[in-house]
Design a protein with these regions (language model features):
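A composition-driven surface/loop motif
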Residues: 1-240
Length: 240
């Protein structure tokens, strides 16, 4: 089974009810195409996932509602990847962005069951324009948010509040012996742009990092907490 709740096409959740999902053998929720949570949704509770809690091709978009992902998730909490053709090439389609887009709602994630797990993991961009996030990255090598591309954070659709606790230490998995990476609050392989938001990143784990950006980091807004931004060029204009 690919997931407890699985669709070959896109998956949209709406309505005022609560959805409880337990993925005993693989992902809890998965779709080959995009996954979208409408504003009307009350709550999605991932009670267990043997792999990712939420896994989607094309992109993931959260417009509202509450998403709770517990510590029993074995891999990533929310992962978006590109949809590939039969030759493993990225399908050229405007919807095939590999992105995670959050416009509102509440996302609560605890990463403590597996090393090298991520709260939000996108092959494309992570774009946040509203919402409340609380992510506890407790396992070794875990990351609160990680993108292979760029991350943009603002408050264009709703108030944005992000709190990430990076309490884990180095990943000790055998396959990562050559690169025993640290626990991090945020890891951005491209550029990070923060236009407006309240962000608190606490890197209290041994050698844990707050925010790591390989590209250029541009900040306009309010950033709170203890953390470091490294491996990038930093332009910071912080208004108190």
């Amino acid at each position: 089974h690919k997931a407890c709740l699985y669709t070959k096409g896109h998956l949209e959740l709406s309505g005022e009810g609560t959805l409880n999902v337990t993925g005993n053998s693989n992902h809890a929720i998965a779709s080959k195409e995009y996954f979208q949570v409408k504003r009307s949704v009350k709550a999605i509770n991932i009670l267990k996932a043997a792999n990712d809690a939420i896994h989607a091709g094309q992109y993931i978009q959260v417009n509202g509602g509450e998403i709770n992902i517990t510590s029993t998730t074995t891999n990533d909490a929310m992962q978006a990847e590109y949809k590939l053709d039969d030759n493993n090439a990225i399908i050229q389609d405007p919807e095939n962005t590999g992105s995670i887009i959050v416009k509102g709602g509440t996302i609560n994630i605890e990463l403590s069951n597996s090393q090298d797990s991520k709260g939000l993991k996108a092959e494309g961009d992570i774009i946040i324009s509203g919402g409340s996030f609380k992510i506890d990255a407790l396992s070794n090598g875990s990351r609160g948010m990680q993108t292979d591309a760029n991350m943009v954070i603002n408050q264009n659709d709703a108030t944005t509040s992000i709190t990430i606790n990076a309490k884990g230490t180095k990943c000790t998995l055998a396959e990562d012996a050559a690169d025993p990476h640290n626990c991090m609050g945020m890891k951005v392989d491209g550029n990070l742009t923060i236009n407006d938001a309240t962000i608190k990143v606490y890197n209290t784990g041994k050698k844990a990092k707050g925010i790591k950006v390989k590209g250029t980091c541009t900040i306009n807004g309010v950033v709170k907490g203890s953390g470091t931004i490294n491996e990038g060029n930093i332009t910071a204009t912080i208004d108190n």
